[in-house]
């Protein structure tokens, strides 16, 4: 075989292989779409129930009170840490 014949044979093999791969991928995409539709037909996703909006409750304002109540404790803890680590 000459170089030209080998080159033609290589191109033929390359395009045949690429064609088979593209056809296989298209069939795979088609099959995945069909399986997806079948699964959604037999096992539909539940429709989410709308929940009522929550109103502001006294417990939410208690969170702010907790932060204000803990502020001196946090300041004391930072001061103690700085004192023991020699950062001051």
Swiss-Prot record:
Any GO BP annotation: sodium ion export across plasma membrane
Q: Which UniProt keywords apply?
A: Cell membrane, Ion transport, Membrane, Sodium, Sodium transport, Translocase, Transmembrane, Transmembrane helix, Transport
What EC number(s) has UniProt assigned to this enzyme?
7.2.4.2
Q: Which cofactors does this protein require?
A: Na(+)
Query: Which Gene Ontology cellular component terms are annotated?
Result: plasma membrane
Q: Chief localization class?
A: membrane
Question: This protein's superkingdom?
Answer: Bacteria
Catalytic activity, as annotated: oxaloacetate + 2 Na(+)(in) + H(+) = pyruvate + 2 Na(+)(out) + CO2
- Annotated Pfam families: OAD_gamma (PF04277)
Q: Which residues cross the membrane?
A: 13-35
What topology does it adopt in the membrane?
Single-pass membrane protein
Q: Name one GO molecular function term.
A: sodium ion transmembrane transporter activity
Localization terms from the record: Cell membrane
Q: Summarize subunit and interaction data from the UniProt record for this chain.
A: Heterotrimer of an alpha, a beta and a gamma subunit.
NCBIfam families, sorted: oadG_fam, PRK02919.1
Give a short account of what the protein does.
Catalyzes the decarboxylation of oxaloacetate coupled to Na(+) translocation.
Regarding protein family, the annotation reads: Belongs to the OadG family.
Please name the HAMAP family in this protein's record.
OadG (MF_00404)
> What is this protein called in UniProt?
Probable oxaloacetate decarboxylase gamma chain
Q: Which organism is it from?
A: Mannheimia succiniciproducens (strain KCTC 0769BP / MBEL55E)
Gene giving rise to this polypeptide: oadG
